[in-house]
């Protein structure tokens, strides 16, 4: 039986702004673009975020830099380190999010739990909501330890997005789906983020298992960077998250828009 996330204890209804934006219609694949707040500067990340928001993406994920980013590959790690060296903070990242959110595309924050705890979770939730953020991903926050942080996010009308990995067992997938709102994030590989030539075999079985347990949109991330990847994902998930490839473009003084437009051609 499909687990309606709106029925999970204290969870948000399924039809949030984020869920509506990412739900596939007619088999099309939605695209979520990732940038790092403060990379290479606060102003530049806002400018890039606005350009990406106007490029046809369904949502934008903004990373909050952290000194110990366990899930980040080398490209995103470098971006985070540079942002920290330039003085980016949680408060600064919320300002970046506010600047990008004005464009109308849903903004999702990706943050590790320690910066949130250091900032004050209740304050973080309130200010993220005021900034126009739609949801938050905390990859190192287990469901069993999610309260009271997830409760404060819910009270601020923010989706809490949890992740499913290739190694996640079916009963655990059901639990994750019942606690997620906005969408469920499927990690395509075991390990860290980063551009890859090929996506792993067997990932479609994971997507199918997740869909048994939720009516939320299902997004795939980690290693997605090519049109071939988008074609392989289309019809199996609702959305694809592209991160390292865009951050690499920004490293080269670009904005990732040309890459996004090329990828979007393979989404329909």
Where are the regions that the model predicts?
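Hydrophobic faces of well-ordered beta-strands that scaffold small-molecule active sites
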Residues: 31-35, 60-62, 107-111, 136-138, ...
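Glycine-rich phosphate-binding active-site loops on the catalytic face of alpha/beta enzymes
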Residues: 62-67, 135-137, 142-145, 186-194, ...
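Active-site-adjacent beta->alpha loops and helix N-cap segments on the catalytic face
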Residues: 13-21, 68-76, 88-95, 117-122, ...
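Alpha/beta catalytic cores of nucleotide-metabolism and tRNA/nucleoside-modifying enzymes
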Residues: 3, 7, 206-216, 225-268
């Amino acid at each position: 039986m499909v687990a309606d996330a709106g029925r999970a204890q204290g969870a948000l209804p399924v039809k949030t702004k984020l869920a509506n934006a990412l739900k596939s219609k007619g088999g099309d694949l939605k695209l979520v673009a990732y940038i790092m707040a403060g990379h290479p500067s606060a102003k530049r990340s806002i400018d890039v975020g606005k350009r990406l928001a106007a490029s046809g993406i369904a949502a934008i994920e903004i990373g909050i830099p952290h000194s110990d980013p366990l899930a980040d590959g080398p490209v995103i790690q470098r971006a985070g380190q540079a942002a920290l060296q330039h003085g980016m903070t949680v408060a600064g990242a919320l300002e970046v999010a506010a600047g990008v959110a004005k464009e109308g595309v849903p903004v999702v924050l990706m943050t590790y739990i320690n910066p949130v705890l250091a900032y004050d979770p209740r304050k973080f939730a309130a200010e993220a909501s005021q900034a126009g953020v739609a949801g938050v991903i905390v990859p190192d926050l287990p469901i069993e330890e999610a309260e009271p942080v997830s409760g404060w996010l819910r009270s601020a009308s923010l989706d809490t997005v949890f992740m499913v990995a290739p190694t996640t067992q079916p009963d655990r997938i059901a639990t994750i789906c019942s606690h997620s709102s906005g969408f469920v994030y499927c990690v395509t590989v075991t390990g860290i983020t980063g551009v890859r030539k090929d996506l792993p075999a067997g990932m479609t079985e994971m997507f199918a298992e997740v869909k048994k347990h939720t009516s939320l949109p299902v997004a795939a991330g980690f290693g997605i960077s090519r049109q071939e990847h988008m074609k392989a994902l289309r019809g199996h998930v609702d959305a694809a998250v592209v991160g390292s490839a865009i951050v690499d473009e920004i490293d080269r003084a670009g904005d990732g828009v040309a890459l996004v437009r090329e990828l979007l051609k393979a989404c329909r």
